Amino acid sequence: GGAKAILTLDNGETVYLDENADGRQLQLAGKQIQIDSTTLNYSAANGQVVQSALVYNKVEVPQGGEYTLVLNDGTKVHLNSMSSLRFPLTFEAGKREVELAGEAYFEVNKTGHPFTVSTQGMQI
């Protein structure tokens, strides 16, 4: 399938992540987020102002799609068709947790802090 996904921001706004999103940038909670047709990169936002409350975003991949997401800690998540990932814009100190529905491949950046994936009532 092709690279396509839908990003839902914590305020409910949706952004379609496809070839029309190439080169686009989002301002989220004072952070600059890079978008292209295959990857959404939050790691460039690392080191900028950290907010006090966690802000969650969600990427959903429709049937026939796939998409790669780079979390703010540098972890790469390759989401398959009919899958979604809910994740914080920035992780809390010492703890990295995301919620997965469906199927994904994680390339976890080794930071010395645990990385937890919650899926269907289980934590991995």
State each model region's role:
Residues 1-124:
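Short acidic/polar, Gly/Pro-enriched loop/turn segments located at secondary-structure boundaries
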